[in-house]
Amino acid sequence: MRNITISAYTPTEFTIENISDTVAKISAWPFEIGYGITLAHPLRRLLYTSTVGYAPTAIHIDGVAHEFDSMRGMLEDVALFIINLKKLRFKIKSDSNKEIVEFSFKGSKEIYGKDLNNDQVEVVNKDAYLATINEDAELEFTLIVEKGIGYIPSEEIKEFLNDPKFIALDAFFTPVREATYDIEKVLFEDNPDYEKVVLTVTTDGQITPNEAFQNALEAMYKQLSVFDKITNVRSVIKNQATSNELENTKLLQNITDLNLSARSYNCLEKAGVVYIGELALMSVSELAGLKNLGKKSLDEIKNIMENIGFPVGTSKLSDNKEILKNKIAELKAQNEG
């Protein structure tokens, strides 16, 4: 039976199963009913559209006027050569967003992706076939390889070409070959009404599936950040997360859990100290200044607090002091009510 709640459960489980260098299964759970597809579908779209990759954007072949031309000594016509070329998956070796690369082949030869590897670019699908030339052929071409996202048709690329001898190419930048998701039922705290999202990501080898998934997440965060300018949701979420983390520590437990001597406990109780976190928030001088707290009790409290990982006056709470203070005040108000 589902309990009445005032907010959706935040998933806590996440796994990545690397099936190969180019395939991974990414799972997260438990989601409330309906939340799985709400998040999985846009992530899938972003995997295709926002993941950065490389592609040839233009080519000039010596002796060739246009893509429907033919070339002496090459088995393929130029159109088929370009189709094969677009199947090659390039990586630029430098930090540059663009490389102009020259290639030259002579004599009888079958040309594969591995034959285009040089100091500027790498072809990740090395065994992909490109062309066959005979002993009379001299195949010389210049290729522009660029970094980008998504897909840009040749008509748009043509507008940016300054050299008319280059043939514009359809540019398939995305390194994600396939992204699919499944929404599975999952049992959580004896409740079967939760969902598990399983994303299967396949890349072409330019990047790993994990890198592609990270890129998609970053793109989603950036797109949603425009709404945060007014709502300040990220700050609220951070504070809520920190509050949840505090609840999982000893800081919000009663000082009775410290097993103090009766003298030390009675002194703290009379001073109004209820929670362990109050001791962590105090400085040593503040603690020593409590009425009737002797040196023996002071040393006892200091030693016990050090043993649980939160020494008196600890700096570990630097960013969370106000959150802890507010949480303790809230708990005290509830107890008084």
Swiss-Prot record:
Q: Which reaction does it catalyse?
A: RNA(n) + a ribonucleoside 5'-triphosphate = RNA(n+1) + diphosphate
User: Keyword set for this entry?
Assistant: DNA-directed RNA polymerase, Nucleotidyltransferase, Transcription, Transferase
Query: What would be an example GO MF term here?
Result: DNA-directed RNA polymerase activity
Disulfide links within the chain = none
* Top-level EC class: transferase
Q: What function does the entry list?
A: DNA-dependent RNA polymerase catalyzes the transcription of DNA into RNA using the four ribonucleoside triphosphates as substrates.
Report what the protein is called: DNA-directed RNA polymerase subunit alpha
